[in-house]
Amino acid sequence: MHSIYAVLALALMPLVAAQPARAQNDPTIHMVTYIDVAPAAKDQAAALLKPLAEASRKDAGNLLFQILQRTAPAHQFVILATWKDQQSLDAHDAAAHNKQFRSQVEPHLIAPIDDRLCIPTFVAAQISREVLASLGDSSIYVVTHVDVPGNVRDKILPALEALAEQSRKEAGNLRFDVSYQKTRTNHFTVMENWKDQSANDTHELAAHTRAFRGVLTPITGALYDQRWYKAM
């Protein structure tokens, strides 16, 4: 079985060149925010998150602000935000609507809000807000935290790039982006959006997906943390 994964991984390596890495002078940043509330408070949290999203999308420099609710357990949420630059994010952090949300949701939290500032690494053109708004309830999101020891970071980078490039070519894929965490550069967030669960299921069985897992599993520093979400 290991030999199969090795062959698949080697087959994908020439594909890395097609999608360029982030330009050094590109100031765009991603913020991935995990919010876990008490199970009984999931509806209250959702009610607080919706106005936060509406206000934040109007912030200067905001390019994307998505609120996602985990399919199971449903009391876990994630915010996927893209900002033009650090200054825009700083202004959002200081904004009244952001501070109000954090104050109001605090009594419902079962863990501190987990903000992860990320640097776009392998990204494609962003889908428009109009297209996102038109997606039906069948659309599925996947957010995966990939953690490897620092001394093998360079080994996982080409595997992540190949995975992203091949996955974007799949039927039903709407987004497949990879970012690394600014403070821990060996931690990555993979952000996916699929037309429906069937498209995602097909992706999970694809040769390039299995090849990536074959590269990652022997070197990972943690369990494979993959979560499915629906847009609110």
Which residues make up each language-model segment?
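Surface-exposed interaction/gating patches
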Residues: 132-175
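N-terminal secretory signal peptides that target proteins for export/translocation
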Residues: 1-2
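An amphipathic, aromatic/His-enriched active-site/gating alpha helix that lines ligand/cofactor pockets
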Residues: 54-64, 82-117, 166-174, 193-227
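N-terminal targeting signals for Sec/Tat export/insertion, comprising classic cleavable signal peptides
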Residues: 27-63, 83
